[in-house]
């Protein structure tokens, strides 16, 4: 199967789609006005310390102060208050930082909703093959490199470049890479870190000292270890920028870059626009006739599986099992496609067969193994729910593309026409008891006004008799279904 990246650029927005086997697997979106800040390094100032939460708020120049938990302050953290490194043994936040203290921090989670960015003092700088860890002294190897001999070879090579500046993590893409390329990567990361430290020493430097790559370059770097067949870009300027980037950092990718100039929009090649639209819907259809219902809330994401129209097996247990197996593949894809993170609760169709439960869990684990984002599955709970987590760093596709519904304010439901009609009648009675008026004028949405003049007209007539006043109904086209006004005349 072929795998490729499609890069679509429009003014102020860049989108990158990862296509595998002709199917959209991931979509990444970045807008100039809301560019993600994960990976950025800042010289911040502690604005508030909260011992009760074991956390501190840090001013890094954003609208909202960023959040730093005590567990994210690493033992090798450099306290800017005094430039010596301290080995912290006490985890009390009030003994780790103080209000007004300057601190070097890195963003690990973008601001989300009412929450500010989340920070760490465990700063890392990624490149194609390595991740540089300032202040560390060891070499780590990606768990996805399974060959023990290769792990030892890589550790031996990279260990030579560890010094007082820091240590390294060897990424999956480094498997089989020669010493020369690893040395080049290590030298590049150290140059970047040297520049960061030089900026930090300038008295006038506040806030950002290092910025992550732009979206197209960042995705290309992160997908460098994937078996990409080509990268198509519909912007000449971005294409030339990526040519320069790959020539310096990922030379073997340069030949795979193409400038797309076709008349058909680049995302129409694989029906990406419609796939994005479907990723915003609650319901996900399964080929068998079953379906998923995905609900994203601030606390967690829930996934409910239903057999729907699938009645393909005579044995009910087999029907349920096959639907759940199919659902595991769809769930893994939807988590990547929608970029859902945090706590995820999956409500599989109840299975009494323990072997079926074990095989469904295994299928889910296998499907999630393709995900580059860290996931953890806790298995079935006593209630039969599967609890798992997926590392959240950036906003979900829904949060990037959508706003809260102005009608329901995020509830997902609106009051029925009947409910609003009765609210209006109660409001008329309330106003009648509180104030003196000759008659009432009701402004309501078209649907509610029609109901008051139609099926609810008898009830409204009884209200008129009770208050002894005429009630006139007028349509207000701009009102949503829940909006109304009762005016005294």
UniProtKB/Swiss-Prot annotation:
Function: Acts in the processing of the 5'-end of precursors of 16S rRNA. Confers adaptive resistance to aminoglycoside antibiotics through modulation of 16S rRNA processing. An endoribonuclease, it prefers 5'-monophosphorylated substrates and cleaves single-stranded sites rich in A and U residues; also contributes to 23S rRNA processing, tRNA processing and mRNA turnover. Involved in decay of speF mRNA, has a preference for adenine nucleotides.
Protein family per UniProt: Belongs to the RNase E/G family. RNase G subfamily.
A GO cellular component annotation in the UniProt record: cytoplasm
Enzyme class: hydrolase
Cofactor entry: Mg(2+)
Gene Ontology biological-process entries: rRNA processing; tRNA processing
Cellular compartments annotated: Cytoplasm
Enzyme Commission code: 3.1.26.-
Keywords from the named record: Cytoplasm, Endonuclease, Hydrolase, Magnesium, Metal-binding, Nuclease, RNA-binding, rRNA processing, rRNA-binding, tRNA processing, tRNA-binding
GO molecular function, one term: rRNA binding
Classification of source organism: Bacteria, Pseudomonadati, Pseudomonadota, Gammaproteobacteria, Enterobacterales
InterPro entries, A to Z: NA-bd_OB-fold, RNA-bd_AU-1/RNase_E/G, RNase_E/G, RNase_E_G_thioredoxin-like, S1_domain
Cofactor binding description: Binds 1 Mg(2+) ion per subunit.
Entries under SMART domains matching the protein: S1
Chief location category: cytoplasm
Subunit structure: Homodimer, and possible higher multimers.
Consequence of gene disruption: No visible phenotype in rich media. Significant accumulation of a 16S rRNA precursor. Increased resistance to aminoglycoside antibiotics kanamycin and paramomycin. Increased lifetime of speF mRNA.
Binding site for Mg(2+): 304, 347
Descriptive protein name: Ribonuclease G
Transmembrane stretches, start-end: none
UniProt-listed Pfam families: RNase_E_G, RNase_E_G_Thio, S1
Domain S1 motif stretches: 39-128
């Amino acid at each position: 199967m072929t795998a490729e990246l499609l890069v679509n650029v429009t003014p102020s927005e860049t989108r990158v789609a990862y296509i595998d086997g002709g199917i959209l697997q991931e979509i990444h979106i970045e807008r100039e006005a809301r560019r993600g800040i994960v990976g950025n390094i800042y010289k911040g100032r502690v604005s508030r310390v909260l011992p009760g939460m074991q956390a501190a708020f840090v001013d890094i120049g954003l609208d909202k102060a960023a959040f730093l938990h005590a567990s994210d302050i690493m033992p090798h953290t450099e306290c800017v208050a005094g430039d010596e490194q301290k080995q912290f043994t006490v985890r009390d936040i009030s003994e780790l930082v103080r209000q007004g203290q300057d601190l070097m921090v890195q963003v690990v989670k973008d601001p989300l909703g009412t929450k500010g960015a989340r920070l760490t003092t465990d700063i890392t700088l990624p490149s194609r093959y390595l991740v540089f860890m300032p202040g560390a002294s060891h070499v780590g190897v990606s768990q996805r490199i399974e060959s023990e001999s290769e792990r030892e070879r890589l550790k031996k090579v990279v260990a030579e470049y560890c010094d007082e500046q820091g240590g390294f993590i060897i990424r999956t893409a480094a498997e089989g890479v020669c010493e020369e390329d690893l040395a080049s990567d290590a030298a590049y990361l150290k140059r970047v870190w040297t520049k960061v430290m030089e900026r930090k020493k300038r008295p006038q430097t506040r806030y950002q000292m290092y910025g992550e790559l732009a979206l197209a370059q960042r995705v290309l770097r992160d997908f460098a270890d994937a078996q990409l067949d080509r990268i198509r870009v519909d912007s000449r300027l971005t294409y030339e920028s990526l040519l320069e980037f790959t020539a310096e950092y990922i030379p073997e990718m340069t030949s795979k870059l193409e400038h797309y100039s076709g008349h058909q929009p680049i995302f129409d090649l694989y029906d990406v626009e419609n796939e994005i639209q479907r990723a915003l819907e609650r319901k996900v259809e399964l080929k068998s006739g079953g379906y998923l219902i995905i609900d994203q809330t601030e606390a967690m994401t829930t996934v409910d599986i239903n057999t729907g129209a699938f009645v393909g097996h005579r044995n009910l247990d087999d029907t349920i099992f096959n639907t759940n197996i199919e659902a595991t593949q769809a769930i893994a894809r939807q988590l990547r496609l929608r970029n859902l993170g945090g706590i995820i609760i999956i409500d599989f169709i109840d299975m009494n067969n323990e072997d079926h439960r074990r095989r469904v869990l295994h299928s889910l684990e296998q499907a999630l193994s393709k995900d580059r984002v860290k996931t953890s599955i806790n298995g079935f709970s006593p209630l039969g729910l599967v609890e798992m987590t997926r590392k959240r760093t950036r906003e979900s596709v829904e949060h990037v593309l959508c706003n809260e519904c102005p009608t329901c304010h995020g509830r997902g439901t609106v009051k029925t026409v009947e409910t609003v009609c009765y609210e209006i009648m109660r409001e008329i009675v309330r106003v009648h008891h509180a104030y003196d008026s000759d008659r009432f004028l009701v402004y309501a949405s078209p649907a509610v006004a029609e109901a008051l003049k139609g099926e609810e007209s008898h009830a409204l007539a009884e209200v008129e008799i009770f208050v002894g006043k005429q009630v006139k109904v007028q349509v207000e086209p701009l009102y949503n279904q829940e909006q109304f006004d009762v005016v005294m005349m």
